[in-house]
UniProtKB/Swiss-Prot annotation:
Belongs to the Ycf4 family. The keyword Membrane applies. Pfam families: Ycf4. GO terms for biological process: photosynthesis. The gene is ycf4. The lineage of its organism: Eukaryota, Viridiplantae, Streptophyta, Embryophyta, Tracheophyta. Disulfide bonds: none annotated. The chain crosses the membrane at residues 22-42, 57-77. It comes from Draba nemorosa (Woodland whitlowgrass). This is Photosystem I assembly protein Ycf4.
């Protein structure tokens, strides 16, 4: 989502609060909870899940392994839920032609660098760079090349933009910033 005027362009960045992340966190939580229940029921010899008899799974080695997978899955699920709660990766890119300043803001993990705020002068922007890798794991990324700073990604790699959409966005941004486009 973005907002534009004649001299200001604001690009809002979706962080980790995406539907796919909610689905993965929920599925992982339920699956790991199931593994932990099966491991616990095999240890105690009681039937917590009525799909099968607890005597069918011996605690050593199957019950131990299932308990381990359940605990590991719960930790990963907890990590996913925390990133969703903190909305890691969200923020905005603000391009202001009047002031000649570019501001990039992202939310990070809690701590000292929770708020990631970058500021550049527009005259330091060398180019807008598109990196396209086709194949099994296709990757399309839009970078802003800054003099003395290197390349800063503007679009996340997990967003599934087509090559045409990336090119369109790069052309609009390069025209707005009055810088050239590089393709790699």
């Amino acid at each position: 989502m973005s907002w534009r005027s004649e001299s200001i362009w604001i690009e809002f960045i979706t962080g980790s609060r995406k539907t796919s992340n909610f689905c993965w966190a929920f599925i992982l939580f339920l699956g790991s909870l199931g593994f932990l229940l099966v491991g616990t029921s095999s240890y105690l010899g009681r039937n917590f899940i009525s799909l099968f008899a607890s005597q069918q799974i011996i605690f050593f080695p199957q019950g131990i392994v299932m308990s381990f997978y359940g605990i590991a899955g719960l930790f990963i699920s907890c990590y996913l839920w925390c990133t969703i709660l903190w909305n890691v990766g969200s923020g905005y890119d603000l391009f202001d032609r009047k002031e000649g300043i570019v501001r990039i803001f992202r939310w990070g993990f809690p701590g000292k660098s929770r708020r990631i705020f970058l500021r550049f002068l527009m005259k330091d922007i060398q180019s807008i760079r598109i990196e396209v890798k086709e194949g099994v794991s296709a990757r399309r990324v839009l970078y802003m090349e800054i003099r003395g700073q290197g390349a800063i990604p503007l679009i996340r790699t997990d967003e599934n933009f087509t090559t045409r959409e990336i090119e369109q966005k790069a052309a609009e941004l390069a025209y707005f910033l009055r810088v050239p486009i590089e393709v790699f």
